[in-house]
Design a protein with these regions (language model features):
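A compositional/biophysical signature of low hydrophobicity enriched in polar/charged and small residues
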Residues: 1-75
């Protein structure tokens, strides 16, 4: 399943975080954004359980991450 993770950072080192993200097998692409969110990551996971585990164990454990939100692609 495809999903997108919106990520807001405590600090402004987007490149460092994107470099970490793209090393993860679930992350297809990651981009810097301007506005409320700092990064958007395109994700590919097997199911919603794997998505939840990924967000809780791999995204939210990054010390620089202040806030995240997940968007699941419907079609």
């Amino acid at each position: 399943m495809k999903a997108f993770a919106l990520i807001s950072l405590k600090s402004c080192d987007e490149k460092k975080i994107i470099d970490k993200l793209v090393e993860l097998p679930e992350v297809q692409n990651a981009y810097v954004l301007f506005g409320e969110w700092d990064i958007i990551a395109e994700l590919n996971v097997e199911n919603s359980e794997e998505l939840g585990t990924f967000m809780m164990e791999k995204i939210r454990t990054i010390p620089e991450v202040k806030l995240s939100s997940t968007l699941i692609v419907a079609k």
